[in-house]
């Protein structure tokens, strides 16, 4: 059983209890933790849409600690991140592997971070199917289609050529945050919260 801490907030109307994750959503912080699957993805998509409706001009902060998971679930989160108006700042804490690394890279350019001792991994999608030869061929072609789509997403967000992405994705590629920064998965390795604030000021100054 997972233990989720409860926090008590004092308001003018008295005390109110929140689970810790719901309280952090009030601060526009979303957690992507554990395997990426349909139920978790639905909650994250709902949180993104809610925070956009609350304030479409204020950043959302996504903290990622995930080994990856179901591609379609991950892509539903990815598409929503691109769809909504607020910038989504991503931060890797622990690990961002497979679909987790794609979500990390999909944050707003200039606002993608990793803590210094995190681990990041990219690879091509995998899957298995049993049945008639024709059915196996259909599913194999679908995996190849998904592989091409994921490669194109990494190409878009890292600035690398498609050929380079295909080479890196051929096998499991583990990297530390500094290597992830060099290949464009993140923008900066940070150790303290103040580093994010400094970076955001710099980005705003460049835009202005």
Curated annotation (Swiss-Prot):
Protein origin, superkingdom: Bacteria
MF terms (GO), sorted A to Z: ATP-dependent peptidase activity; ATPase binding; serine-type endopeptidase activity
Coiled coil: none
Catalytic activity: Hydrolysis of proteins to small peptides in the presence of ATP and magnesium. alpha-casein is the usual test substrate. In the absence of ATP, only oligopeptides shorter than five residues are hydrolyzed (such as succinyl-Leu-Tyr-|-NHMec, and Leu-Tyr-Leu-|-Tyr-Trp, in which cleavage of the -Tyr-|-Leu- and -Tyr-|-Trp bonds also occurs)
PROSITE patterns, per the entry: CLP_PROTEASE_HIS, CLP_PROTEASE_SER
Keyword Ion transport attached: no
GO cellular component terms, semicolon-separated: cytoplasm; endopeptidase Clp complex
The protein's Enzyme Commission number: 3.4.21.92
Role: Cleaves peptides in various proteins in a process that requires ATP hydrolysis. Has a chymotrypsin-like activity. Plays a major role in the degradation of misfolded proteins.
Subunit structure: Fourteen ClpP subunits assemble into 2 heptameric rings which stack back to back to give a disk-like structure with a central cavity, resembling the structure of eukaryotic proteasomes.
Family: Belongs to the peptidase S14 family.
Protein name: ATP-dependent Clp protease proteolytic subunit
């Amino acid at each position: 059983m997972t233990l989720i801490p409860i926090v008590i907030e004092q308001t003018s109307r008295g005390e109110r209890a929140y689970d810790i994750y719901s309280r952090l959503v009030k601060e526009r912080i979303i957690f992507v933790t554990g395997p990426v699957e349909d139920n978790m993805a639905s909650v994250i998509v709902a949180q993104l849409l809610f925070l956009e409706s609350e304030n479409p001009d204020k950043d959302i902060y996504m903290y990622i600690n995930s080994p990856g998971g179901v591609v379609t679930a991950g892509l539903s989160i990815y598409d929503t991140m691109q769809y909504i108006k607020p910038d989504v700042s991503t931060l890797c804490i622990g690990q961002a592997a497979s679909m987790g690394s794609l979500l990390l890279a999909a944050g707003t350019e200039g606002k993608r971070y990793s803590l210094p001792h995190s681990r990041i991994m990219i690879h091509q999608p995998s899957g298995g199917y049993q049945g008639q030869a024709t059915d196996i061929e259909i599913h194999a072609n679908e995996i190849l289609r998904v592989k091409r789509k994921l490669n194109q997403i990494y190409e878009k967000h890292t600035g690398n050529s498609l050929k380079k992405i295909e080479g890196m994705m051929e096998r499991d590629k583990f990297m530390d945050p500094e290597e992830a920064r060099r290949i464009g998965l993140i923008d900066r390795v940070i150790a303290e919260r103040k580093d994010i604030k400094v970076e955001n000021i710099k980005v705003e100054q460049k835009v202005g």
